[in-house]
């Protein structure tokens, strides 16, 4: 079944979707579209969770800041503990739960840990989609990206500018650039991503649930749903 602007009100089985893509590939935008198309779907973003931890200056947040400022991916153990705890707290481990994961897992070790956790609850991932976007496009997006930190709303000065320059459309509060939204840091992040993404893609291809779509389209194919 092909997702379009209409809502998908019925699926043959609970959808547990992993959205893959390099930093800046548009995973947040795709997530927003999917949540509108599938009302019963919920989402969790590792990036949003981390930013919340950093803002609260928790122990985990301070530890994560060190890695992010250097353009490095977080260690498997650190991010895995955070995400699996949140999945459990939200009650999303039961077989009937429907959700979308953005930004996790990023390594085969994280993927294996997630599979094992879901297996313990008689559940599993059943669709993995990668957003394919040229690196030049990503870097251009990042240079023009601003965010409203409290809500997570993202703006781009070229194709999604705020109504009032520098201010959030809803609250009127100031927009900021993320700590890692610089070309220098992002190039490092893209290299780190490439190193871990190929093994991760191979991991999910073996399970038969992997697919790729252009990150510049809104089309995601839902097979057998």
From Swiss-Prot:
The keyword Iron does not apply. Present with 704 molecules/cell in log phase SD medium. Consists of three domains, a large central CORE domain and two small peripheral domains, NMPbind and LID, which undergo movements during catalysis. The LID domain closes over the site of phosphoryl transfer upon GTP binding. Assembling and dissambling the active center during each catalytic cycle provides an effective means to prevent GTP hydrolysis. PANTHER family: NUCLEOTIDE KINASE (PTHR23359). Induction: Expression level is low on glucose or other fermentable carbon sources. Induced about 3-fold on glycerol, and significantly induced by ethanol. This is GTP:AMP phosphotransferase, mitochondrial. It comes from Saccharomyces cerevisiae (strain ATCC 204508 / S288c). Keywords: GTP-binding, Kinase, Mitochondrion, Nucleotide-binding, Transferase. GO terms for molecular function: adenylate kinase activity; ATP binding; GTP binding; nucleoside triphosphate adenylate kinase activity. Belongs to the adenylate kinase family. AK3 subfamily.
């Amino acid at each position: 079944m092909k997702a379009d602007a209409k809502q998908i009100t019925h699926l043959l089985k609970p959808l547990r979707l992993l959205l893959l893509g390099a930093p800046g590939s548009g995973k947040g935008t795709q997530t927003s579209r999917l949540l509108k198309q599938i009302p019963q779907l919920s989402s969790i973003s590792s990036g949003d969770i981390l930013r919340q931890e950093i803002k609260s200056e928790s122990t985990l947040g301070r530890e994560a800041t060190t890695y992010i400022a250097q353009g490095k991916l977080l260690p498997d153990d650190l991010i895995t503990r955070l995400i699996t705890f949140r999945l459990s707290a939200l009650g999303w481990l039961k077989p009937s739960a429907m959700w979308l994961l953005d930004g996790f897992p990023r390594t085969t070790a994280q993927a294996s840990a997630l599979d094992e956790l879901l297996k313990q609850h008689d559940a599993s991932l059943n669709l993995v989609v990668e957003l394919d976007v040229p690196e030049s496009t990503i870097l251009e997006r990042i240079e023009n990206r601003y965010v409203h930190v409290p809500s997570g709303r993202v703006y781009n000065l070229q194709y999604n500018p705020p109504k009032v320059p520098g201010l959030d459309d809803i609250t009127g509060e100031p927009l900021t650039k993320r700590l890692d939204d610089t070309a220098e840091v992002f190039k490092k992040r893209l290299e780190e991503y490439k190193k871990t993404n190929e093994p991760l893609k191979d991991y999910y291809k073996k399970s038969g649930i992997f697919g790729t779509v252009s990150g510049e389209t809104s089309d995601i194919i839902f097979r057998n749903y």
